[in-house]
Amino acid sequence: MPMIEVTTTEIVDREAAIAIKKALGGNISIFPGKPESRVMVVIRGETPIFFGGEEGPAALISVALFGEQPDETYDKYARVAVEAIVKALPTIDKSRIYVKYQTLTHKAWGKDFA
């Protein structure tokens, strides 16, 4: 299950959260074998972030994926993710959005332990 976490300094209302979820979750299929039906998206707003030592509107997008992915998919997804944040939260400049990826070697679903 891909896990996407968005942390931002801004207030995220329901409309913005849904737009971000649709864009980031809906485009997870950029990564082979990663359908939207298997993605979890967490969005946190109003979190202090210091980017380059400066406080101000910013966002961190963390994407955790099981297994290595083709190199070109990381940049392609980052472009989609940055565009989605700028569109949903226009107070954030794209130069203040950081996208990080984590490759997972193990996975566990709650249902696996029932």
Predicted region positions:
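Interaction-mediating elements
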Residues: M1-A114
